[in-house]
Amino acid sequence: MSKSYTLKAEVRERVGKGSSRELRRNGFIPAVIYGDKQPPLAISVPYKEVFYKIHGGGFRTTIATLEIGKEKIQVLPKDYQLDPVRDFPMHVDFLRVSAKSIVHVNIPVHFLNEDTAPGIKRGGVLNIVRHEIECTAPANAIPDAIQIDLSSYSIGDSIHISAVQLPEGVTPVIQDRNFTIATIAAPAGMGDTSEEENNESDAKK
């Protein structure tokens, strides 16, 4: 889990496109805090700090503490909007959380030992079906990533969720099927390895 961080925020007295543009000109981003059965709270947060948090990775899986005057609110970033041309953050949604909160998060998948995987060493290609897995997790123990070790996978193998050891308290949202996360596909022209081996065996008889 990434280390929690603190952002200073201010309550927005005005909302709307005009006030949002003015905030951005002054180095801030409009944002909203919602959840925990409380009314939404319109705030502004520093542009520069949020920009680096978003593009540094782990933004939506890391708890933040928003300091608004003397009040401190624990939140989890749930969504953000980027400028379609310049990739600048335009707006952020924060969810109120506590140590007991269970949240829905999309956790990125990281593949380990790709260079030593038997299937890839033989020319196979890692075909990633899911770059993220939607899970429920304790708000204070969200993993930065779900790690999958490829060192035992060969060409033709599929990696299903049942083969992945998830951290304690983390549960995939999809429960009705053993979904595929990735496969080791044969390179073009190689064909099915098991079929070729059977044909060779038949020829020797």
Curated annotation (Swiss-Prot):
Transcription regulation is among the record's keywords: no
GO biological process entries: translation
Pfam families per UniProt: Ribosomal_L25p (PF01386), Ribosomal_TL5_C (PF14693)
An example molecular function term from Gene Ontology annotations: structural constituent of ribosome
S-S bridge residues: none
Entry keyword set: Ribonucleoprotein, Ribosomal protein, RNA-binding, rRNA-binding
InterPro entries, per database record: Rbsml_bL25/Gln-tRNA_synth_N (IPR020056), Ribosomal_bL25/Gln-tRNA_synth (IPR011035), Ribosomal_bL25_b-dom (IPR020057), Ribosomal_bL25_C (IPR037121), Ribosomal_bL25_long (IPR001021), Ribosomal_L25_dom (IPR029751), Ribosomal_uL5_bac-type (IPR020930)
HAMAP family, per the entry: Ribosomal_bL25_CTC
Record-given protein name: Large ribosomal subunit protein bL25
Organism from which the protein derives: Bartonella bacilliformis (strain ATCC 35685 / KC583 / Herrer 020/F12,63)
Lineage: Bacteria, Pseudomonadati, Pseudomonadota, Alphaproteobacteria, Hyphomicrobiales
